[in-house]
Amino acid sequence: VVIGHETTINIMRAYSVPNAQLITVRGGEDYDFGNVSIRVIPSLHSPLNDKRYYQSAVVEEGATHPLRISQLVEGGSLMFLVRLAGHQVLTMGSMNFIERQIEELRPDIVLVGAAPSHLEIYEYTPRLMRALGFPRVVMPTHADNFQAPYGSAIAYRTEWVEAFSEE
């Protein structure tokens, strides 16, 4: 099952993922799938282009593959709180958040965006950790150059993770 905004779902359709496996959300949904439940949390994209990033575009239904990188618009940012076997894992889609949406969450594990754009957000790391009650396990993610070939020397940016960890 793929859960996401309209853009995510339309990209999946372009690549022939069956509609029965697609769930379109906006944020705020909380679904029970039996052994696992997933809460969809509204979020924000990180500030790009000297804090002037705003993109309201979506990938429209009917898009066909292969999609070019210029067609892969943001389409909206979400976080997902996955609950499984008494544990909670929070995964962030970008380097930003809406504080009031997460301040009562207490995930065991959080996957946090760690690219340099998080430095444009006021006290990103301290505010995030306080809001989440200082999770025991914090895994930096999104420290990649998605335009570089997977496995290449510039695909993974170790210095981004190190800078985030020092905060």
Feature locations, PLM:
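Active-site metal-binding motif and surrounding structural segment of the metallo-beta-lactamase
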Residues: 1-14, 18-24, 105-110
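Short amphipathic alpha-helical segments and helix-helix/interface helices
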Residues: 9, 79, 99-102, 125-130, ...
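Binuclear metal-ion centers of metallo-dependent hydrolases, dominated by the metallo-beta-lactamase
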Residues: 16-30, 126-167
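Active-site environment of divalent metal-dependent phosphoester hydrolases
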Residues: 9-12, 27-32, 46-49, 96-100, ...
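Short, conserved loop/helix-junction motifs that constitute active-site signature segments
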Residues: 1, 103-106, 128-135
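Core dinuclear metal-dependent hydrolase active-site scaffold
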Residues: 25-102
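Active-site neighborhood of phospho(di)ester-bond hydrolases with catalytic His/Asp-centered motifs
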Residues: 1-6, 90-94, 110-115, 138-142
